[in-house]
């Protein structure tokens, strides 16, 4: 919720991963389009978050880190479940960084892990890594 994000920001987290609904709750107004997100993202950064991954479902995700914005394309996959997709995205990103990948490549891995989880096809994660495009915004 918005209040949860405010409380967490006081601790200066290295990474947070809201989705659009959670970002809307933090902002206090609906954010239906990615073009409406930057002001709220900036408020999260000013509030203490270092890196932010904004998940947007089939529209992909954005990584805000040190003034750089990366966009990972969404993949059209069959939806088996959305439960755990955010956790898969976070764990993919953290695992990638721990493996020594660049932020861009760790973000690609994160998006692939989330897509594989949604599809219920975790064994296809490496294939999804090759299919996901990441570009700087």
Predicted regions and their residues:
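Conserved beta-alpha-beta core of the PfkB/ribokinase-like small-molecule kinase fold
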Residues: 1-35
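Conserved phosphate-binding/catalytic region of the ribokinase-like
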Residues: 6-7, 34-137
